[in-house]
Amino acid sequence: MERGKPPRGTAGQNFEKTECFESMVLKHHTLNPFDRKPQGAVATGGQVRLRLTVEDEQAPVELFLRVWNGDERRYPMRPLGLKDGRMIYEAQIGVGDKPRLLWYRFECEYKGEHVVLGAPGDHTGCGEGVMGSEESFQLTVYDAAYDTPAWMRDGVMYQIMVDRFCRGEGTDALMHAKDGQNIILHEDWNEMPFLNIAENGDNFANDFFGGNLEGVRQKLPYLKQLGVSVLYFNPIFCARTNHKYDTSDYRKVDPMFGDEQALARLCKEAEALGMRVMLDGVFSHVGDDSLYFNRRGTYGEHEGAYRDPNSPFFKWFTFRHWPDDYECWWGFKTLPNVNEMDEDYRRFILEDDDSVVRHWVKKGTSGWRLDVADELPMPFLRELRRQVKDVSKDAAVLGEVWEDASHKVAYGQMRSYVLGDTLDSVMNYPLRDALIAFLMAQKDAAAVAKELSSLAQNYPKPFLYALMNLMGSHDRPRILNVLAGNDGSDIPRSQRADHRLSQEERMIGALREQLMLRFMFSVPGMPCIYYGDEAGVEGCADPFCRRTYPWGREDQDMLARYKAMAAMRNGHPVLKTGECAYIAPCSAVLGVIRKNENGKDAFGKKAENACAVTLINRSAREVVVYLTSADVSGAQTLVSDDGQIFTARSGAFSVKIKGLQGMTMFAM
C-alpha cells in the first residue's frame, strides 16, 4: 500500500550519489522534539511544527513540506536561522478536523536536481530521514473526543480458556455427548490435550477437561492475590469445540461452562473484588454446527441456511452453489463466513436494543475482545463501538490486530484502527515479537527501542495506554518454550504432546521470561497473563499451549515473580500513566523510562512527580550501563525494586546489571 505519492524509489535502496547529495544534506528525525512538536499522534484541530536542518549553510534553497492524504499540499518552509552552523527551516501546519493519517516529506530543487528527504524504508513512517527516499513520514490525526476507559491503562489482564482453568461443580460436562456429538472427557486434569486431526489438517478439538465458570469464580481470590483486575475469557458461547471459536448460539452460554446466571454471578463477585470481565466476540464466522447454518442437522432437518434456502439466516452466508459450496474462514468448512454487512445480521449482532453485543454488556461484562478484527468491515466496527458505548461508556472494544494498527494493510486496503472511531485498542503483538527478538539475540536493543518508539509515535495516547500487552496466548506456543529456544516447531505435530524442555532449557527460558515480564509490566498498556504462564506451564503450539492450569503443581519461583511484578506496577502509578521513552544503553540492554513531571501524568492529569527506569540485560554476562541525572528528571538517587541504592556522581549513574537479570529503579 502506497504512502504518499507512488514512490519512485524505496528507502534503503542504494541511491546514486549526485553532486547535490554530496554538497547538501537534509536532516529530520520524527522522534526528536526539536524536529517535530508535539511528539506522537495529534488530535483534530491541533497544530504541528516540523523542522528541517540543512547541513550546508550557504545552500540557496527553497524548501517545501509536502503533505499528502489523497490530495497533495505543499507548504513553503521558512528559514529560522543558524544553529551550530546549520540552517534551520520550519513549517507549522494545522491538521484539520478530520481523523486520518497524514503523510509528509521534504523536497527542494537544488542545482538542477530534485532533492527529497523521506522516511526510512522500514514501513513504520517514523525515524531519521533518508536522503532520496520518497517514502513518507506518518502523522496520525485522531478524533479529539476519543478516549478509552481508565481501567484499561490501569489494569492487569488475565486470559482464561474456561475449559482448561478450573473444574467447579454444577455444570454438565457431558452435555455435548448427550446431543449425539463424539467428545472425549478427560478424567485426569493434568494429562495433555489430545490431537485429533481431521483430513484438512485441522484439529477436531473435541476433548474437554470440564473447566467452567464456577471454577473461575472459586479462584477469584487467587486472581486477586496475583494482582489481576481484568479477566478476558476466550469464547464462552455454545459451540461444538473446546475452543468455542465456532459459535453455535450467540445468546447462550455453553452449558459445559454454566449458564447466564453463572456468568452474572461471576461478574458480580469479580466486580466486588475490583475485577472486570471481557468476552471474546467471534463475528466474522460461525460454526457449521450452529443454529444459523446447521450443516449437521443438530437443530432440525429443515432449519438453518445449509438446509433451507428460505431460512431467515440464509442471507448471512455466501453460497457459490448451495448447499455445499460456500465461503468459509481460511478454507475450513466447519467455519462458514458471515456477511457482516447483511442488514439482518447487523441488527442481530449490533443494532437491536437487545443485540448480541448490547445484551452481554447489559449482563455485567465490560466489553469485547474481537477475534480477527482486521477481517471485519470498518463500518461494522464503527457501529459495534457505537452500540457498546451506548450501553456503557466504560465498556471496551479491543481488537485482534497483529501489526502496527495505525496502518494495517488487510485485503489490499490500508486500515487505521487508531483514529477513535473503531477500536479502543488492540493486542500488542508487535511489542511481544520485538521483545522475543531482543531476548533471543535476533535484534539489538537499539533496533527494538526504535520499533517501540515508532509504535508510540503512531498511536494516540488513549490507544497506546490501553494496549493488551500479551506475552503468551492460545494462538502461540507457551512463552517459556519460545524463550527457551525450543517450541517444538521442528518436530512432527503428532510428537509434540511428549515434548519436554530439558532442565537447562527450562532454566534459561525462565530467566528470559522474567526479563520479558518485567519489561511488560513497565510499559504503557495492560500487561496480560495467559493462564498458567505464571505457574511455569510449558507446551508447543495448539493444542499443547492449551494445557490445564497445574493447581498444586505450580513453579513457585515463577509465580512469585509474577506476583512481584504485578504488585510493583499496581503500587506505582507512574508505571501506568507516566510518560514513556525507550532507551538502548548498549546492544544487550534494553530500557524504558517512565515519568510524571510538573505534577502531571502523560494525560495531563494531576499526579505526583515520579520517575522509574527499567533495564533488562539479555547477555549472560554482567553489564555496566550509564544514565545521566537528566535522564531521570534530575534525580540524584535511584532505588531498585530489590533494594539497591544508586547515587549520581558528576551527574551520572553507573548501574551494574547481572547476566540475564533486570531491575526497575525509582527516583528518590
Locate each region found by the language model:
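Active-site-proximal helices and loops of the catalytic beta/alpha 8
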Residues: C267-R276, S284-H285, S290-E301, V356, ...
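C-terminal beta-strand-rich structural cap/linker in extracellular carbohydrate-active enzymes
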Residues: D56, R649-M668
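Aromatic/acidic polysaccharide-binding cleft in carbohydrate-active enzymes
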Residues: D163, Y411-G412, S425, M468-L501, ...
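Carbohydrate-binding surface patches
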Residues: I583-V632
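Beta-strand-rich binding/interaction modules
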Residues: A59-G70, L102-Y104, E622-G643
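Conserved, mostly hydrophobic/aromatic
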Residues: L52, I160, L223, F233, ...
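Glycan-association/targeting regions that enable binding to alpha-glucans and other polysaccharides
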Residues: E2-D154, Y158-Q159
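Substrate-binding/active-site clefts of carbohydrate-active enzymes
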Residues: M161-V230, I236-K362, L384-D390, H407
